[in-house]
Amino acid sequence: MYTVDASVWVNAFDQREPGHLVSRQFLEVLRDQALPIIVPNLVLAEVAGAISRTRQAPVQAQAFATALSRLPHVTVRGLDEVCALHALTLAAQHGLRGADAVYAAVAREAGSTLVTLDNEHLTRLVNLITVCTPAVALAALTPPPQLPA
């Protein structure tokens, strides 16, 4: 199971961003293999806001975030009091921004791998949860090419 940070969804959406193809391929592999994704409901607002700001396309931003919420292999988890308190603890103990702590809390509670482009996730949480970039996650999901016999 995976928790996919908003940075990856936005990167996959925006062809102008470095690493776009890797993020897109990673999400396509998850979709094609019907691998479960759990994300905080916060991801919807973050993705819509980021796309709207960078592309000046509010209708497209809302459509993408809505489509994300309806993917059959994606579970959108609400931020209840238990998760919020868990995120609070992670933010305080690891110096995370609030939204980053919410993703970490969801990943930790679900026992999922957090896939992110956020350097704070990648450096501050390595001893707490499994966290990696889309490139690392994609490499783990994609079998190496077969050499001719």
Q: Can you annotate each of these PLM segments?
A:
Residues Q15, N41-L42, S69-Q93:
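Acidic catalytic patch
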Residues V8, V43, C83, V102-Y103, ...:
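Alpha-helix capping/helix-boundary segments
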Residues T54-A57, H94, V131-P134:
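Short, hinge-like loop/turn segments at secondary-structure boundaries
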Residues V4, I38-V39, G78, G98, ...:
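Short beta-strand scaffold positions
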Residues M1, V76-R77, A104, R108-A149:
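Acidic, PIN/NYN-like endoribonuclease modules and their adjacent C-terminal/linker elements
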Residues M1-V39, T54-A63, L138-A149:
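Short, well-structured N-terminal submotif of metal-dependent ribonuclease cores
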